[in-house]
Amino acid sequence: MSALNLTVRVHPVVLFQVVDAFERRNADSHRVIGTLLGSVDKGVVEVTNCFCVPHKEHDDQVEAELSYALDMYDLNRKVNSNESVVGWWATGNDVTNHSSVIHEYYARECNNPVHLTVDTSLQGGRMGLRAYVCIQLGVPGGKSGCMFTPIPVELTSYEPETFGLKLLQKTVGVSPAHRPKTVPPMLDLAQISEASTKLQSLLDLILKYVDDVIAHKVTPDNAVGRQLLDLIHSVPHMTHEQFTQMFNANVRNLLLVITLSQLIKTQLQLNEKLTFLPTA
């Protein structure tokens, strides 16, 4: 498959690691680079992990600690053997003169390595994210070169990552003086209440869109219509009594689990106090 047909999907943990490496950089370092880890399947490069590679850039050369990169990759393989080298990343909003030299090294580590740039300077008020592949250029018998060509890049996440991001959003906009050091997980019933409220708001948004389309206030979108049709077909067919019975049964099970967990928590706390109780 041609490198131009690749699509890059980046997980949030990768961006967090890039920002953390940029914040911990040496005082004389203008940018940070590192290795991208993940997998490639059917033209999709999924980047799930990364690590920083110490380096120094001079006017005419680049010095990188390649032995450190190999050791970090070997350690990561022991933890997750499914992740392999898929490319490299760098902070900044564009490709520099040294990028082709660094890319040559990663071209020996994997086929069609991707280059990911993360704009940690937040130009335009947002963190720019771009992905490139290197295309060889030249004529037969003449000089050859390479050109970094942009390819599609998008953010994706697993369900646990999405849940973690929602917890992080609870502290966004809170001043550092009042920001809590920890965010405890919500109780199960509170999660159900929050999810129900969000579901209700989404349903209201869908109903408003449908009403506007019927009233010719909004131009209909065929893609949205197909998604709504798939959503309707995904709803299980059951009567109101069946749904109420199923919902009540699930609530009873949830309350039973909460009660048992609280009893276990109380028993552990009591056992801890009895263990450290001074004996006469």
UniProtKB/Swiss-Prot annotation:
GO term, biological process aspect, one: antibacterial innate immune response
GO CC term (a single one): eukaryotic 48S preinitiation complex
UniProt keyword Flavoprotein, yes or no: no
Compartment(s): Cytoplasm
PROSITE patterns: MPN
Keywords: Cytoplasm, Initiation factor, Protein biosynthesis
InterPro entries cross-referenced by the UniProt entry: eIF3f, EIF3F/CSN6-like_C, JAMM/MPN+_dom, MPN
Disulfide pattern: none
Domain annotation MPN: ranges: 8-138
GO molecular-function term, one example from the UniProt record: translation initiation factor activity
Similarity field: Belongs to the eIF-3 subunit F family.
Subunit structure and binding partners: Component of the eukaryotic translation initiation factor 3 (eIF-3) complex. The eIF-3 complex interacts with pix.
Biological role stated in the UniProt entry: Component of the eukaryotic translation initiation factor 3 (eIF-3) complex, which is involved in protein synthesis of a specialized repertoire of mRNAs and, together with other initiation factors, stimulates binding of mRNA and methionyl-tRNAi to the 40S ribosome. The eIF-3 complex specifically targets and initiates translation of a subset of mRNAs involved in cell proliferation.
Protein name: Eukaryotic translation initiation factor 3 subunit F-1
Species in which this protein is naturally found: Drosophila melanogaster (Fruit fly)
Gene from which this protein is expressed: eIF3f1
